[in-house]
């Protein structure tokens, strides 16, 4: 499907510091995934974007194919690390467009502030980074509940997708469950350290680029603006 360009500096465990899949040609668009995810969160978007842009779909550190950070890494240190690796991957002053979902929204906004004026556009989908990342009474199930039961693990993946990301059961396909299961298994950093870190509003206030914020029609995030 999408070729894996893994031409990055690697760590002792032979993983890229921040893995990337590249596709298409044109101006650069960089995609940042959500918590317990990977570049595959953007599976349905990459081909469409690649008709106009060079798409760079990342695995954040400690996610997917990327190298692992220390367990005690704080949210602020994590954002600093991503920034250092990112400028190695994208040196120079060429314009950048960034898009981030949830956890990735907080990362993308932090980078947009640090890299201004290189970042010309920022698109955020139900972004994290508010001071509190609580979702009321969402009945999320723990993946630990499954133990070694693969069937139960996939059932929990399906349940949590409907609670957190997809409102229509018809959209929770086997492919969607595969993506969720793979992301959960390869998550090695607690995204809540960033998603609940309170950096988003301060970062947004300093931006001069074009910003678009999107929430799903049934997104119950406390930070979603009311529908008029």
How should each PLM-predicted stretch be described?
Residues 41-43, 66-72, 133-136, 224-226:
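Conserved catalytic-core motifs of eukaryotic protein kinase domains, centered on the activation segment
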Residues 16-65:
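Conserved HGGG/HGGXW glycine-rich cap/lid loop of the alpha/beta-hydrolase fold
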Residues 1-17:
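N-terminal cap/lid segment of alpha/beta-hydrolase-fold proteins
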Residues 100, 104, 108:
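Gly/Ala-rich beta-loop-alpha elbow adjacent to hydrolase catalytic centers
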Residues 215-228:
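Conserved loop-alpha-helix segment in the C-terminal half of the alpha/beta-hydrolase fold
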Residues 109-113, 120-151:
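Flexible "cap/lid" loop of the alpha/beta hydrolase fold
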Residues 11-13, 56-100:
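Active-site loop/oxyanion-hole signature of alpha/beta-hydrolase fold enzymes
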Residues 151-209:
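Conserved alpha/beta-hydrolase catalytic His-Asp/Glu region
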């Amino acid at each position: 499907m999408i070729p894996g360009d893994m031409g990055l500096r690697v760590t002792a465990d032979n993983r890229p510091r921040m893995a990337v899949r590249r596709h298409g040609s044109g101006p650069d668009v960089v995609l940042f995934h959500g918590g317990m995810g990977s570049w595959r969160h953007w599976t349905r978007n990459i081909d469409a974007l690649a008709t106009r842009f060079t798409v760079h779909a990342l695995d954040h550190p400690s996610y997917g194919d990327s190298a692992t950070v220390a367990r005690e890494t704080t949210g602020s240190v994590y954002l600093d690390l991503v920034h250092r690796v990112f400028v190695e991957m994208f040196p120079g002053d060429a314009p950048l467009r960034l898009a981030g979902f949830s956890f990735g929204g907080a990362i993308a906004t932090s980078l947009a502030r640090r890299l201004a004026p290189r970042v010309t556009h920022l698109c955020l989908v139900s972004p994290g980074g508010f001071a509190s990342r609580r979702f009321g009474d969402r009945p999320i199930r723990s993946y630990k509940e499954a133990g070694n039961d693969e069937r139960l693990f996939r059932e929990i993946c399906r349940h949590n997708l409907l609670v957190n990301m997809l409102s229509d059961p018809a959209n929770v396909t086997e492919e969607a469950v595969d993506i969720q299961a793979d992301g959960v298994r390869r998550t090695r950093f607690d995204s809540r350290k960033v998603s609940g870190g309170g950096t988003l509003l301060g970062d947004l206030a300093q931006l001069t680029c074009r910003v678009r914020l999107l929430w799903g029609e049934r997104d119950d995030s406390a930070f979603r603006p009311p529908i008029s």
